[in-house]
C-alpha cells in the first residue's frame, strides 16, 4: 500500500514538473483568452488615466484638440522631425526608426548612423529625421530652415515626376525650460558646440556681428553655469521659441530690425501658432502620453512602450533658488511657450482618451445587444406554431356539449 502511494505521488509530481517546463517554453507565446470569453484588455492600460480635476488654462477649439490624421505611408506623406537640442529627441528619433511596427521596417545596420526607411511600395523615404536622412538641412535645423529646405532636399533625393506633391507632417518634442537649459549647459561643458549649425534664414546665414560667439577657441568646455548664463548671445536662451518661430518675421538674427519687446512678442506668438499647426508634439516629462498621442495621430503603433527616465544629467545638477529664477528670466519666452504647450498637450490627451472611452462603451453596448439577439433567435426558431382547431373538430365539441 505504501509503495503504491509512493508511486502515485511520484507520478503527480512528475506531471506537475512536466507541465511547469511546458509552460516555461510555450506559455509566453500562447494567446490565452480572458475569462468569460471577453477580449483581453487593450493597450489603454499602458497609459495614465486623465486627471478628472485638471483645470484648463487656455481655450482650444475642438479642431485644435482633434489630431487623427490619415497618414498615407504608401502615398506621398512625409513625417518631418524638428529636433530641438536636449529635449529627448535622440531617444524619440531612435523610436521612430527602430520601434515602430511597420509593414516594411526601417533598415538599421550596426555601425551606420542612418537607417533606410522606405515606403512599403517603393524605394522612397517617409521619414525626414536625423536617423533616416541625416542632418540634410543642417545640424538641428529649426522651423525656419526645415520649411524652406525639406521639399528641395527630398525632390533631389526622390524626384517627384508626375506624381502629386508631398504632404509634410511636422513633429517635435518640448521640455521644461529650466531642465533643458541645465542639460544644454552640461553638454556644452563637456565640449559640444553645434558650431556646424547653419542658422539659415531668408537665404543667408547670420553675420559674426549678428551672432557673435560666446567663447574663444574650439569649444566652451569647462565653462561654469555663471559663464554660460552671462553670455548675451547664448542661443540656449529661449531656444525652443526661436527654433519653432518663423524668424523671417523679425528680421532673422538682426536684432536692430525691430524693438526688442516687439521682437519677443512676435517670436512667441509665431512659435505658438506653428506649434498648434504641427501634426504632433510631445513633452519629455510625459513619455507615455507622448507615445499615446503619436500613435493615435498617425495610426502607427510602437513595439515597446516608452519609458520615463527622470534621472537625467540635468537632474543631477544642484542649483539654488536664485539661480533657478535667473534661468527662468533668461528663458521667459520658453517658460510661456511651455506653459501654453503643456496645457494644449494635456487637453489633447484628455480629449482623445474620453473620445476612445465613449466609443468603447458604444461598441460594448452594440456587442451586448447583438449577443442578446443571437440568444433569442434559437428559442423563436424551435417554437412550434399553435394548432388551429378545424371546423369539424369544433362542430364535434359543440355537439357533445
Swiss-Prot record:
Mod. after translation: N-glycosylated.
pH dependence statement: Optimum pH is 6.3.
Subcellular location: Membrane
Region (Disordered) location: 367-389
Residues given in the record as 3'-phosphoadenylyl sulfate binding sites: 83-91, 175, 183, 307-309, 313-314
Active site: 140
Annotated InterPro entries: Heparan_SO4-6-sulfoTrfase, P-loop_NTPase, Sulfotransferase
Class in the EC hierarchy, top level: transferase
Membrane topology: Single-pass type II membrane protein
Record field: transmembrane: 5-27
A Pfam family reported for this protein in Swiss-Prot or TrEMBL: Sulfotransfer_2
Binding sites annotated in the UniProt record for substrate: 113-114, 130, 135, 140, 187, 194
Known function: 6-O-sulfation enzyme which catalyzes the transfer of sulfate from 3'-phosphoadenosine 5'-phosphosulfate (PAPS) to position 6 of the N-sulfoglucosamine residue (GlcNS) of heparan sulfate. Also transfers sulfate to CDSNS-heparin and performs the crucial step modification in the biosynthesis of anticoagulant heparan sulfate (HSact). Critical for normal neuronal development where it may play a role in neuron branching. May also play a role in limb development. May prefer iduronic acid.
Name of the molecule in the record: Heparan-sulfate 6-O-sulfotransferase 1
Native organism: Cricetulus griseus (Chinese hamster)
Amino acid at each position: 500500500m505504501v509503495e503504491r502511494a509512493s508511486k502515485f505521488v511520484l507520478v503527480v509530481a512528475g506531471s506537475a514538473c512536466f507541465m511547469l517546463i511546458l509552460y516555461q517554453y510555450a506559455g509566453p507565446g500562447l494567446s490565452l483568452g480572458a475569462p468569460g470569453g471577453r477580449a483581453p484588455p487593450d493597450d489603454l492600460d499602458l497609459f495614465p488615466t486623465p486627471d478628472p480635476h485638471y483645470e484648463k488654462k487656455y481655450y482650444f477649439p475642438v479642431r485644435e484638440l482633434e489630431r487623427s490624421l490619415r497618414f498615407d505611408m504608401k502615398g506621398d506623406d512625409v513625417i518631418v522631425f524638428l529636433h530641438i537640442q536636449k529635449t529627448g529627441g535622440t531617444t524619440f528619433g531612435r523610436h521612430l526608426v527602430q520601434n515602430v511596427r511597420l509593414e516594411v521596417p526601417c533598415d538599421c545596420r550596426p555601425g551606420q548612423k542612418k537607417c533606410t526607411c522606405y515606403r512599403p511600395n517603393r524605394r522612397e523615404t517617409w521619414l525626414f529625421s536625423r536617423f533616416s536622412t541625416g542632418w540634410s538641412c543642417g545640424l538641428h535645423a529649426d522651423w525656419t530652415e526645415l520649411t524652406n529646405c525639406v521639399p528641395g532636399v527630398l525632390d533631389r533625393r526622390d524626384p517627384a515626376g508626375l506624381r502629386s506633391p508631398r504632404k509634410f507632417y511636422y513633429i517635435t518634442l518640448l521640455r521644461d525650460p529650466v531642465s533643458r537649459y541645465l542639460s544644454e549647459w552640461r553638454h556644452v561643458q563637456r565640449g559640444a558646440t553645434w558650431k556646424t549649425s547653419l542658422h539659415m534664414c531668408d537665404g543667408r546665414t547670420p553675420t559674426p556681428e549678428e551672432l557673435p560667439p560666446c567663447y574663444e577657441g574650439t569649444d566652451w568646455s569647462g565653462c561654469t553655469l555663471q559663464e554660460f548664463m552671462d553670455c548675451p548671445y547664448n542661443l540656449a536662451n529661449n531656444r525652443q521659441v526661436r527654433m519653432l518661430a518663423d524668424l523671417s518675421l523679425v528680421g532673422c538674427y538682426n536684432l536692430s530690425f525691430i524693438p526688442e519687446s516687439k521682437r519677443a512678442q512676435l517670436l512667441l506668438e509665431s512659435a505658438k501658432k506653428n506649434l498648434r499647426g504641427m501634426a504632433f508634439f510631445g513633452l519629455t516629462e510625459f513619455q507615455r502620453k507622448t507615445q499615446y498621442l503619436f500613435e493615435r495621430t498617425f495610426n502607427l503603433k510602437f513595439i515597446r512602450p516608452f519609458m520615463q527616465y527622470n534621472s537625467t544629467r540635468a537632474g543631477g545638477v544642484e542649483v539654488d533658488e536664485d539661480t533657478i529664477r535667473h534661468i527662468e528670466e533668461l528663458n521667459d519666452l520658453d517658460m510661456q511657450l511651455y506653459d501654453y504647450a503643456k496645457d494644449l498637450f494635456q487637453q489633447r490627451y484628455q480629449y482623445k482618451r474620453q473620445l476612445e472611452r465613449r466609443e468603447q462603451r458604444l461598441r460594448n453596448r452594440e456587442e451586448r445587444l447583438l449577443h442578446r439577439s443571437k440568444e433569442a433567435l434559437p428559442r423563436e426558431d424551435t417554437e412550434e406554431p399553435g394548432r388551429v382547431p378545424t371546423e369539424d373538430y369544433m362542430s364535434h365539441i359543440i355537439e357533445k356539449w
